[in-house]
């Protein structure tokens, strides 16, 4: 269910992400070079489990900003409760937290752009990292890439009246990747089948 590591890496190459370090499981070692802009896609589970949920992280050294993007916009408590995942571990393992002053800005997504039963988390991570590549000072919002999707307060994730927003977001994400990724275009039907809006329900 969802996107494989090979798929995400192939689409990331098409998007020409700056210093994309790759895809990782929850043991991601963090950003080891504080002076270079870089980004990665990280799963909340160990690799041997097959994975659960994709997140994106990015580091902008000019402003010393660490970006943490979760397509569901879960709070720290929810991430720990639902996935047993704490992004603080990423910071502690990163060189950006090992510098003498340890001074940085953390910017974390707080709204949901992905529907509750969608398996497109990896694709939304690519969308965010494409925004980071183009607009590293404001990748979360107020740029032409992330403005393609609309955020919803996380506590409304399951509300019926916001589900059309999630459908439109997923279609916008597919359309963006179709424009910018040859790999997505070549494998569109398989990718969409494995990530569609109700994929999680199919697995129950």
UniProtKB/Swiss-Prot annotation:
Gene Ontology molecular-function annotations: cysteine-type endopeptidase activity; DNA binding
UniProt cross-references to SUPFAM superfamilies, sorted A to Z: Cysteine proteinases
Active site, per annotation: 53, 70, 121
EC number: 3.4.22.39
Family annotation (Pfam families): Peptidase_C5
Protein keywords: Autocatalytic cleavage, Disulfide bond, DNA-binding, Host nucleus, Hydrolase, Late protein, Protease, Thiol protease, Virion
Keyword set includes Protease: yes
UniProt catalytic activity: Cleaves proteins of the adenovirus and its host cell at two consensus sites: -Yaa-Xaa-Gly-Gly-|-Xaa- and -Yaa-Xaa-Gly-Xaa-|-Gly- (in which Yaa is Met, Ile or Leu, and Xaa is any amino acid)
Any one GO BP annotation for this protein: proteolysis
InterPro entries named among the record's database cross-references: Papain-like_cys_pep_sf, Peptidase_C5
Enzyme class, first EC level, given as a word: hydrolase
Regulation of catalytic or functional activity: Requires DNA and protease cofactor for maximal activation. Inside nascent virions, becomes partially activated by binding to the viral DNA, allowing it to cleave the cofactor that binds to the protease and fully activates it. Actin, like the viral protease cofactor, seems to act as a cofactor in the cleavage of cytokeratin 18 and of actin itself.
Residues at the site labelled Cleavage: 50-51
Location of this chain's protein in the cell: Virion; Host nucleus
Keyword Glycoprotein: no
Signals that turn on the gene: Expressed in the late phase of the viral replicative cycle.
Oligomeric and partner information: Interacts with protease cofactor pVI-C; this interaction is necessary for protease activation.
HAMAP family found in the cross-reference section: ADV_PRO
UniProt miscellaneous comment: All late proteins expressed from the major late promoter are produced by alternative splicing and alternative polyadenylation of the same gene giving rise to non-overlapping ORFs. A leader sequence is present in the N-terminus of all these mRNAs and is recognized by the viral shutoff protein to provide expression although conventional translation via ribosome scanning from the cap has been shut off in the host cell.
Functional note: Cleaves viral precursor proteins (pTP, pIIIa, pVI, pVII, pVIII, and pX) inside newly assembled particles giving rise to mature virions. Protease complexed to its cofactor slides along the viral DNA to specifically locate and cleave the viral precursors. Mature virions have a weakened organization compared to the unmature virions, thereby facilitating subsequent uncoating. Without maturation, the particle lacks infectivity and is unable to uncoat. Late in adenovirus infection, in the cytoplasm, may participate in the cytoskeleton destruction. Cleaves host cell cytoskeletal keratins K7 and K18.
Family label: Belongs to the peptidase C5 family.
Protein name: Protease
Source species: Porcine adenovirus A serotype 3 (PAdV-3)
